[in-house]
């Protein structure tokens, strides 16, 4: 059968990177920071994966899209 009973204990609660480090503004020119929140294929990682709060996820998405538009980040990464 598909699935089955789940095993394991409690999952560790993800903490927002920006709240924990006191970052209030996400700059689109800071590509090293933005790359942490992009998958290896170039997609923006969701909140459930990164643990980012809703406020900072919106700011992060805007910054990544700006950086892509300014050609600082790629829209997609090539498959090897």
UniProtKB/Swiss-Prot annotation:
It holds the Pfam family Ribosomal_S18. GO terms for cellular component: cytosolic small ribosomal subunit. One of its GO terms (molecular function) is structural constituent of ribosome. It comes from the Bacteria. PANTHER family: 30S RIBOSOMAL PROTEIN S18, SMALL RIBOSOMAL SUBUNIT PROTEIN BS18M. Binds as a heterodimer with protein bS6 to the central domain of the 16S rRNA, where it helps stabilize the platform of the 30S subunit. Belongs to the bacterial ribosomal protein bS18 family. This is Small ribosomal subunit protein bS18.
């Amino acid at each position: 059968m598909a699935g089955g009973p789940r095993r394991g204990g409690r999952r560790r609660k993800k903490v927002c990177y920006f709240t924990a480090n006191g970052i209030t503004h996400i700059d689109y020119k800071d590509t090293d920071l933005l790359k942490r929140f992009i998958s290896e294929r170039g997609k923006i990682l969701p909140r459930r994966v990164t643990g980012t709060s809703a406020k900072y996820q919106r700011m992060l998405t805007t910054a990544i899209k700006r950086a892509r538009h300014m050609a600082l980040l790629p829209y997609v990464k090539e498959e090897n």
